[in-house]
């Protein structure tokens, strides 16, 4: 039996009680699990300072000396402050405790030799350490002359006396028991080529490094291994998918494409649009099913690229569909596509929940007869009665609004799965895209059409609302429209709904000469769409809303976006909301209104928004500030967010190298059966068998 698979209960010092807590709180069930529960930080314990060397700006330091005496000071009727005067023979400091007096007197004795560890501060002209860590100098230090590891613990663990120090002792005991080298999980050729330390060295040094260099090498090796297997799993899945699912071969672009390009397209495509169309064209004639993610900021021209993709399908005798997450966005796509195709005799139909009865039957019959060439819809397209004669291309707008299972249901609409183009206006950082959409090829439209004025973003405090209202009035009198957004409403945040309702009432008093619409997530769909339509048509001048307007609403006449309490929104969400304006020829503005009291992180978010309109810069910053698990849509992917040591936001370079190595393996062994790589495939099976998230990719 592999020693790493032993039950954690049988590690000396654990037993059945602590075993239950470790299982429940950390998911640690075996020795191997504990070995892979990595420290979150380290403190250098290799140096002992003299008291006269201490400075007030030092972080954690350690000193050695003796307790000279104790003193007590009354803080209140029930509370005492205990002070131990501590000397190393050349200076004196105070060790201070604000609670636990009995424990202090019982544990620490005058005249004994101790090593004290903590953060020095100055009080009353003298250095002091509040609630320091203290060890007898005569006892062997766990981390003597090295880096001390610190582990995350929970309240339940602390109740059972499982502190970071206790975990450190458990790991030390375990490593002493593991006398054989820990088995390698990477082939020698990768370890040597990438100058990695062995797995045995990495796992021992990540818990007990002698110095910062040793710690860094250990962590780099373990991060690489983790990200390598994530990428190997994703690329194996993609390779398997390509072998199993052949795609329709579209050998020509066809007359519809040529007529549209030469007769209906009134402007030049950007260089980025041309590049992406070529990438899509190459996919469609390759004989494999296209699975491509198209990223582009708001207004970059993704819908036009999607339309040209669908026209290629039509030119080869197939049908196409485009699915949007909301009815109003589907209606906008329908109107845009009809306008683009005016005079080309291509039948385009709309299918949403609002298309009912006789009209719905007409659309469905024409679809299966092949008369409808392009279908625009919502998730209604996925319903069983919807049948195409020959579906060749499916475009999915705002992928994170559709579950993976829904995407798969599209494949059942024809004899072969259609080519899939996934579009998103939510920029995804490259490292995250490698993980979430690792099975998709990625295209990026990274330039806006010429002449588009960037939105000007301005930060205002809530005390400046009077001048803000004057600016809104001026814009509306110039013929523009305005969004005013309140924070997202959830069932647990009743006050936000009240704020929106109160805000709406107040705005009606402030702007009696203008018409105001109101939209939020608690409204019935029909009521919400009716209010939205009033704003889209220009019947109302102000739209008071929550973030239900975040995706896809296109009102070129709207030139002002006011986001109240914007400190409560993430960067990507703020950027998406800002994307609702700046769609016309006029200068547009995004006003971020906050309270005066802002955390450092919030101030940074606001500053980034005011500095740049680049969605990819914003997405990278958002990933670093919030982490991948918080980003919208990532939880649906089920991929790789159970990382134990790697950080997708900060380990992009390691991720890229890991993907390169994984791709080499897949290229050399696409069927994953070669005995040369048996070690890798065995390890990958182990990871998928023990990790729910890994299994989800497969």
Predicted features, each with a name:
Residues 275-278, 289-607, 671:
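Inter-lobe coupling/hinge segments of SF2-like helicase ATPases
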Residues 66, 119-120, 233, 566, ...:
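Short, surface-exposed secondary-structure boundary micro-motifs
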Residues 37-68:
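OB-fold nucleic-acid-binding modules
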Residues 247-256, 446-449, 584, 632-637:
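Flexible hinge/switch segments at interdomain interfaces of large molecular machines
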Residues 73-264:
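Upstream accessory/linker segments immediately N-terminal to the RecA-like ATPase cores of bacterial MutS
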Residues 513, 532-542, 549-556, 561-564, ...:
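Accessory helical-bundle/CTD segments and flexible terminal tails appended to RecA-like ATPase motors
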């Amino acid at each position: 039996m592999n020693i790493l698979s032993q039950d954690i209960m049988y590690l000396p010092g654990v037993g059945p009680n602590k075993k239950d807590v470790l299982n429940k709180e950390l998911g640690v069930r075996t020795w191997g699990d504990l070995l892979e529960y990595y420290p979150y930080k380290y403190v250098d314990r290799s140096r002992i300072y003299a008291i006269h060397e201490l400075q007030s700006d030092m972080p954690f330091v350690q000193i050695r000396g003796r307790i000279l005496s104790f003193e007590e000071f009354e803080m209140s009727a029930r509370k005492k402050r205990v002070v131990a005067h501590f000397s190393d023979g050349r200076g004196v400091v105070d060790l201070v405790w604000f609670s636990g007096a009995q424990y202090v007197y019982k544990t620490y004795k005058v005249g004994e030799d101790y090593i004290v560890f903590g953060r020095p501060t100055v009080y009353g002209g003298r250095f002091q350490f509040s609630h320091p860590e203290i060890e007898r100098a005569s006892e062997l230090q766990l981390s003597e002359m090295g880096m001390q590891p610190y582990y995350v613990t929970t309240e339940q663990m602390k109740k059972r006396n499982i502190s970071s120090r206790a975990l450190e002792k458990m790991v030390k005991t375990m490593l002493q028991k593991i006398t054989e080298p820990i088995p390698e999980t990477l082939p020698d050729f990768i370890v040597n080529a990438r100058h990695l330390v062995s797995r045995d060295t990495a796992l021992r040094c990540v818990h007990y490094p002698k110095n910062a260099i040793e710690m860094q090498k250990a962590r780099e090796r373990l991060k690489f291994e983790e990200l390598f297997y994530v990428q190997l799993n994703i690329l194996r899945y993609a390779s398997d998918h390509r072998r199993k699912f052949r795609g329709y071969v579209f050998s020509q672009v066809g007359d519809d494409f040529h007529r549209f390009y030469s007769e209906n397209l009134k402007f030049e495509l950007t260089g980025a649009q041309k590049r992406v169309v070529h990438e899509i064209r190459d996919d469609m004639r390759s004989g494999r099913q296209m699975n491509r993610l198209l990223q582009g900021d708001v207004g970059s021209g993704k819908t036009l690229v999607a339309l040209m993709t669908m026209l290629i399908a039509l030119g080869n005798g197939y049908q196409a569909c485009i699915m949007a997450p909301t009815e109003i966005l589907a209606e906008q796509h329908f109107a845009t596509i009809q306008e683009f195709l005016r005079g080309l005799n291509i039948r385009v139909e709309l299918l949403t929940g609002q298309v009912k009865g006789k009209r719905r039957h007409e659309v469905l019959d024409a679809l299966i007869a092949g008369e409808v060439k392009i279908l625009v819809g919502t998730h209604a397209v996925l319903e069983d009665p919807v049948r195409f004669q020959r579906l060749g291309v499916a475009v999915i707008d705002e992928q994170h609004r559709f579950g993976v299972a829904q995407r798969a249901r599209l494949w059942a609409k024809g004899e072969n799965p259609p080519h899939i183009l996934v579009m998103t206006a939510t920029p995804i950082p490259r490292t995250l895209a490698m993980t979430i959409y690792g099975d998709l090829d990625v295209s990026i439209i990274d330039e806006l059409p010429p002449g588009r004025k960037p939105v000007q973003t301005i930060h205002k405090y809530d005390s400046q609302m009077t001048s803000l209202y004057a600016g809104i009035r001026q814009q509306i009198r110039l013929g523009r429209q305005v969004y005013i957004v309140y924070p997202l409403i959830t069932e647990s945040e009743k006050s936000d709904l009240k704020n929106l309702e109160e805000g709406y009432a107040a705005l009606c008093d402030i702007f009696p000469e203008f018409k105001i619409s109101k939209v939020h997530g608690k409204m019935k769909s029909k009521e919400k769409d009716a209010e939205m339509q009033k704003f889209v048509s220009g019947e109302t001048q102000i739209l008071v809303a929550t973030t239900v307007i975040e995706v896809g609403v296109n009102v070129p006449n709207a030139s002002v976006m006011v986001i109240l309490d914007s400190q409560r929104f993430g960067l990507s969400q703020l950027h998406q909301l800002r994307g609702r304006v700046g769609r016309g020829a006029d200068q547009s503005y995004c006003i971020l209104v906050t309270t005066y009291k802002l955390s450092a992180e919030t101030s940074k978010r606001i500053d980034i928004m005011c500095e740049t309109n680049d969605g990819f810069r914003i997405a990278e910053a958002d990933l670093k500030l919030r982490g991948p698990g918080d980003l919208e849509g990532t939880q649906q992917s089920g991929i790789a967010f159970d990382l134990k040591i790697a950080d997708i936001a900060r380990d992009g370079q390691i991720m890229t190298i890991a993907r390169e190595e994984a791709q080499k393996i897949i290229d050399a062994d696409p069927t994953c059966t070669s005995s040369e790589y048996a070690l890798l495939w065995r390890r990958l099976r182990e990871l998928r068998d023990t990790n729910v998230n890994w299994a989800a990719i497969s």
